[in-house]
Amino acid sequence: MSDLTKFNKFFLTPNKLNAFLRVIGLCGLFSVIAISFGIYSYTRNEIPNIASLFLIVLGSVVLFLAFVIHFAALFKRNKLLKKVNKENRTNLWQKEMGNFKAIESFEFFEQGPISSDILPSFYPTALYNFEPLPRQFKVTYKDGSEFVFGHIYAIKRSSNKTEKVACLIAITPAINSENHFFLTDANYSLNKNVAQFEALTENKKQENISLFVEKDSNFSFQNLDTEVLNKVLFNPLNVYAKFNVYNDTVHTYLFMSVPTTFMDTKLKVNEAFDDLVTNIKLQASYDFKTLNSMQKVVDLLHNKLIKKPESKSSSQKSVETEIEKEVKDKLAKN
């Protein structure tokens, strides 16, 4: 990490810098009062003109210096922030993630298996500009399970200020190897120009959910667990995360909205430089919880989303066996 002098660290310590700027602000306020009193006295001749002029000049000089010092301090802080944030501290974040007992290893990919055109529908491409390629990594847990994740940013188009959103993508073996489908919000219009979605021509709707499938496919909401759909994936009361599920018979992609601070190791304006390592530890802790939440949803997809064929009870089987015997006996007699 960057080694900064005490002088530079002062500008990256919000408590100290803000206290200094408040003092400068008070000096500016008193200078305005002095200028106002000087002008008032000069026009009313209540004190000698030389004293009034002195107050006006002194107040003007102090006000100018207060403005220059305030501007210079903020400029210096922003310049140092940019310098500090040019450093890539992902290795520190990765090290902290690896310290959690549940994680065996954490590996980043130069170029992972998630393609750049696999994008979430809850941030439509008409409204957001997405990063060209997700940042991808593999997490191996001590229980033997492995997950490949992609993390992608998008910035809102035609916005006066930078509005970022972020999404996490988990790729796993297909939860259903026979059906090609996409689960999303009911109001979403599928972009058929995307290669993955080209074959999905049928749209089945149920309340606030859309299920896109291939033409003549028998796959429907009857094959899906209602509780997982309504209470987890598309719960309107869940304001913390939005989900999509895309299954292409080889892989399943789970999309989940995450805070823009996910994997963010940059120093913020309201954070002190000396607390940077501590803040990265805290960020890793939040991100670990996010990955755990996503892991639980992935487990639900694999274990519960697709309804399993109902097995016949032993009584049903015995009744069917008796009927079969009766039919065979009748056929034998005939």
From Swiss-Prot:
This is Uncharacterized protein MG456. It is a multi-pass membrane protein. The keyword Cell membrane applies. One of its GO terms (cellular component) is plasma membrane. The chain crosses the membrane at residues 19-39, 55-75. It comes from Mycoplasma genitalium (strain ATCC 33530 / DSM 19775 / NCTC 10195 / G37) (Mycoplasmoides genitalium). Residues 308-334 are annotated as: Disordered. It is found in: Cell membrane. The keyword Ribonucleoprotein does not apply. Keywords: Cell membrane, Membrane, Transmembrane, Transmembrane helix. Residues 319-334 have a biased composition (Basic and acidic residues).
